[in-house]
């Protein structure tokens, strides 16, 4: 055997071994993560928040929505079971119906989108399915929207769930995106509107309040302004992933926040999940966002 052949053979063995080790590490990570969830107390609440980018035709045709929906269904069947799954950009009724009908044995409850939209606008895309009973308390559409967001009915939904005799309030929202123009001031008006219409009416309540969704806020200073305004708390992220967008910028845009006064949460673990490992596919074949979980 020549030196060149020997080196090629050695390189092949090295690549094969590194691939096996990498897959074993990923599998071990998910086994440990699932075991951690099983160990959680029964009265804890498990939440998954995911921007799934499911547009109605004709826009959805360009993003392989049907194939991506099937991948999302498969991953949610393989992953840990959650009490509540909150979706953003679930604009397509056909896709929502497909996902719900495929998962209703695991998640028998849903609250479909209930927006007052104009004929030329999309709905809010804010949808929820759950393994426990869930009730819609209130919802509204933002007054201020800019650029392409003006063609949607973005807003916020307030839900109630009860687990082990403990009630929780959960807000699902999707705020203004940035385009060539940065729209931080629009997002400020939007979370102020959330405070006025959904948070303040429940200010004196002893019910724990959680805010989830795609906030489109990547700068820590801007997030801190929102947290201070609403009296909410963020927390550290477990795991290796520290961003939720799959774009070139790798930004953290999606959050699970909790009310910081009156209500004291014993603990909450946040983790950004690469769900593609369940199917051995590229993450973009699911969505352009990673989901974030809170337990």
How would you name each of these model-derived features?
Residues 2-102, 118-122, 288:
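N-terminal, active-site-proximal structural segment of metallo-dependent hydrolase catalytic domains
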Residues 19-37, 199-210, 216-295:
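Metal-dependent phosphoester-hydrolase catalytic domains
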Residues 28-38, 84, 88-175, 269-274:
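Structured beta-strand-rich core segments of catalytic domains in phosphoester-bond hydrolases
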Residues 42, 121, 149-153, 247-249, ...:
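A generic structural micro-feature
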Residues 45-52, 72-99, 129, 159-160, ...:
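Active-site beta-strand/loop signature of hydrolases that rely on acidic residues for catalysis
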Residues 54-57, 92-95, 121, 177-180, ...:
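Active-site environment of divalent metal-dependent phosphoester hydrolases
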Residues 56-61, 141-149, 175-187:
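Surface-exposed cleft-lining segments at the edges of enzyme active sites
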Residues 63-67, 182-199:
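Alpha-helical scaffold elements lining the catalytic groove of polysaccharide deacetylases
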């Amino acid at each position: 055997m020549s030196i060149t052949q020997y080196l090629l053979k050695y390189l092949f063995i090295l690549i094969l071994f590194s691939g096996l080790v990498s897959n074993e590490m990923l599998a071990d990570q998910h086994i440990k993560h699932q075991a951690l969830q099983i160990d959680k107390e029964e009265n804890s609440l498990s939440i998954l928040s995911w921007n799934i980018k499911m547009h109605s035709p004709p826009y959805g045709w360009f993003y392989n929505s049907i194939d991506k929906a099937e991948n999302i269904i498969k991953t949610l069947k393989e992953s840990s079971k959650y009490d509540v799954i909150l979706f953003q950009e679930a604009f397509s009724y056909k896709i929502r119906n497909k996902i719900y009908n495929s998962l209703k044995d695991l998640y028998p409850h849903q609250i479909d989108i209930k927006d007052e939209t104009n004929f030329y606008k999309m709905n809010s895309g804010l949808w929820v399915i759950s393994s426990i009973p869930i009730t819609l308390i209130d919802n509204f559409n933002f007054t201020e929207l800019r650029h392409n967001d003006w063609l949607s009915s973005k807003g916020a939904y307030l839900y109630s769930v009860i687990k082990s005799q403990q009630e929780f309030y959960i807000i699902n929202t999707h705020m203004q995106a940035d385009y060539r123009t940065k729209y931080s001031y629009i997002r400020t008006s939007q979370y102020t509107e959330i405070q006025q219409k959904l948070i303040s009416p429940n200010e004196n309540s002893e019910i724990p309040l959680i805010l989830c969704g795609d906030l489109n806020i990547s700068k820590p200073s801007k997030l801190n302004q929102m947290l201070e305004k609403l009296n909410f708390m963020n927390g550290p992220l477990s795991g290796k992933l520290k961003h939720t967008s799959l774009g070139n910028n790798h930004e953290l845009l999606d959050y699970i926040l909790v009310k910081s006064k009156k209500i004291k949460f014993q603990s909450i673990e946040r983790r950004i999940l690469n769900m593609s490992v369940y199917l051995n596919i590229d993450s973009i074949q699911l969505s352009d966002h990673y989901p974030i979980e809170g337990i």
